[in-house]
């Protein structure tokens, strides 16, 4: 099954005031026990195109493997008040495999000029995905943006805390 996400689906997690939005930000290809994310290239204003993201209620680790393109996998762990406690970014290139721990939030960001294609090893039921903190705060603690041709991080003003960004 193929699901296409539209600019309307993504608007609630983008920086406030964004006008130019990628029409079809990403697609999901679901089959048996896996999902392929196909994230379109482009920008939503100055923010790189991304997936909506979610916090995982899945009891185990999830494996993400980049099949094509380049981008960033964002991971965030919140405290009990839904404030960011840890923020980690992992650079994605073809064949890169990333494990996302239980209870962490994740989002895929396409920083390249081609599609970003990423495989997840599990199909999650709606009960396994918690989007509420992301929707309430319009995204994760930082937005991934382009400034002067470089990848940069802009603080999301809806968070009180902005932890140090760690990379992998």
Regions found by a protein language model. Give the residues of each.
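Histidine-centered metal-chelating micro-motifs
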Residues: 96-98, 102-107
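Active-site region of the double-stranded beta-helix
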Residues: 1-91, 109-168
